[in-house]
Amino acid sequence: MKLFGVDVGGTFTDIIFSDTETRVTAIHKVPTTLDDPSTGVVQGILELCDRQYIDRTAIDHVFHGTTIATNAILEYDGAKTGMITTEGYRDIIHIGRHQRPQNYSIMQEIPWQDRPLVQRRHRLAIAERMGPVKGQVITPVQEDQVRGAVATLKERGVDSIIVNFLFSYTNPEHEQRVKEIIEEEYPEAFVTISSEVSPQFREFERFTTASINGFVGPKVKNYIQNLEQSLKDSGISAELHIMCSNGGVATPKTVSEKPVNTLLSGPAAGILGGAWAGELTNRQKLITFDVGGTSADIGIITDSGYGESSARDTWIAGYPVMVPMIDIHTIGAGGGSIAHIDEGGAFKVGPRSAGSRPGPACYGHGGLKPTVSDANVVLGRIDEHNFLGGEMKIYTNAAYKVIDELAGQLDLSRERTAEGVLQIMNNNMANAIREKTIQKGEDPREFSLVAFGGAGPLHAVEVAQILNIPEVIIPLYPGINSATGLLTTDLKYDVIKTEFMMSTNMDFSGLNEDLAGLETQLINQLKEDGVSKQDIRILRSADCRYAGQGYELRVDLPDVFLDEETIVDALNNFHESHKAEYGHNFTDSPIEFVNIRVTGTGYMPKIEKQAIHHEYQLEDALLKTGDATFNIDGSLVKVEINFYQREKIPVGAEFNGPCIVLQKDTTTVIPPNCTAYIEEYGNMIIKVGV
């Protein structure tokens, strides 16, 4: 099969092609067309088809990672929204949980109040009420009030209507009926009901999640429609699948209805790309390290795979989001991070970034602030003639100027200042990794660090040295790792049902019936998407807690009829998980089941392993020698090093640091006392010395 993976970033759109029959792989980058990213997507696919002589009509699948929803929420640039809610509860999404994001600040910035997803004047209440336990109707929905509310919102020019009713997770009947009325009265509106997006208890989080879906919905839906039409107009009839935050892909129809599931589309694909590098190199315990121009994304992969964020810890742009997401930790640290001295006189790097325009001073686009990239230029780690394969000029004098200005404020030399910028940057990223490993009971010394993104390989080895991580893996195509990850996943859907139940008083009949119903729902959806029964896999789990707790842990449920005997392993696993997470457990205390979950995956074709073969010798890869500065035993030393061209380094040949490896999509810095080699599938393995 002929597969394309396309990941859209803020600066570049990355494309990878894989033919599963011939095992041919090709990559391409084009500038992202910010006004309409679908233009760049189609342009990149067509250019790669022309270059590789690929018949565009023979493409089978296009897998796509998108930032449309992410950017809409980060930039607060979504639809004009309205909300219909239960009488007395229109301010749930404003009040929240009385959290103070900055405990001691007298100038609080509370996102759901400062940047409301639905303006208060567009939040209309109607009479209706469901019971909190069994979902019994207490107050029937007043349809005349609904029609009046819809007419009001339509008159006010609202594009998207969100329906958030109290206790709708117990019985969605009222929300579903209101959706029908909206579609009758205002068919042009984008409609979201909370019981379809996140049918879980916790009203503030559920209401907010549904509101995000409505806020980003019209923009995502229009984008997907444009992309589908553009592909069709270009003669590409391939099936399109969109990357979701849970680590799987979904159909355009599903994503158009629930775009909130794509908020971490790109970073999730990056985690999968890191896992693919681990599979190729037979490593199971991995720390993924994706560093771009603005941010660094950290992910953890263990023997059991990647983790999923806890519902209580999942926030996007300051808003709580209660949908399944891969556990990713993001900090403001990247190649464009600005070095500065704060009001208290502290030397800091980030989180502010120069972005792509004007960008770092060394880009020559008018940047006037010292950045991490400028520090790398000063220390000789970014080559002025071979950046982006020689396609982009680096202005070293501009980098010297901004670092010198910072050095004057610090009363340090140019090189010492640049080294200080990198030390702060590297320690910030090391601390982020500590949060995801040591603070979670994992020892980073037992992991390999998989580095990718434009800036990840520049810093990975020195970050690994800080944490005593013994090995760094640089994928074959680190700059398009997220696009590669798109070709390694499956269709994946999650369904959830809130169901409170104590382990001392289990309703096994109801539990088994509900699990069977959720499984049937998923199987039907996957079959509708064209997945055959033998390619469907179902996993069951539950969110549990000790009685009286306000947070849950997820445990797997066996794929058997549940009763007092078959549930024992799940209960024991909860005790073990609680001890691993918090350092203690209460084995004599009853366990409360809160939510039951079912995850369904449908097999999709994937990229195939392809060993690399060429006739080069290591000396053929030597591009030049030059000077670079490294911290050796506490002293800055300028040394002459080799600059290697990565695509010409032969498999198995070892080479020692200090040296720098150049390729079009990134630069890899290998400090002193480190050794590297290329394994059979093209991944660079760096053995880290201290």
From Swiss-Prot:
Q: Which domain of life is it from?
A: Bacteria
MF annotations from Gene Ontology:
5-oxoprolinase (ATP-hydrolyzing) activity; hydrolase activity, acting on carbon-nitrogen (but not peptide) bonds
Query: What is the recorded name of this protein?
Result: Putative D-/L-hydantoinase subunit A
Q: What is the lineage of its organism?
A: Bacteria, Pseudomonadati, Pseudomonadota
Extract the InterPro entries matched here. Answer: ACX-like_C, ATPase_NBD, Hydant_A_N, Hydantoinase_A, Oxoprolinase-like
User: Can you tell me which residues the record assigns to a coiled coil?
Assistant: none
Give me any GO biological process, just one: glutathione metabolic process
**What EC identifiers does the entry list?**
3.5.2.-
Origin species: Pseudomonas sp. (strain NS671)
The UniProt family comment states: Belongs to the HyuA family.
**Enzyme class of the recorded protein, top EC level:** hydrolase
